């Protein structure tokens, strides 16, 4: 497909950003949710987007999540590059993710806890569009409330599984210390 801008949500891997920028495009993020991704894609005239669940949005065909389009794009790229899957995988950035959650009780609300975190001194770049996302040089943490139960979800990404899990557990401990 043609080169250009891409979009994924705040809880998705940095890999799309890295690949987009390597190829001279611009990467944009959106809050979690397909409609947020699609709206941002339309605003930025993105050529590709999606969320971390594997469903991609490819506007050249339609503005909807379509895992089969993702498979077709992957297979055509694999064929064009004449590589094995493992060779292709090793050519892309490697990141690992971890997930944790904190159940709130005693009337504590996720919004108040997230606000307290956002106002604290943080050592990264803060994004408040969907909870609290903090980007560090080689990792990130995204803290967001559930819309269905009193919990805060913790999503992290780092270069190794151990690094991602360590970051998730550190933030779980930080949040628990605020409760």
Q: What are the language-model segments listed below?
A:
Residues 2-179:
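Phosphate-binding and adjacent anionic-ligand microenvironments
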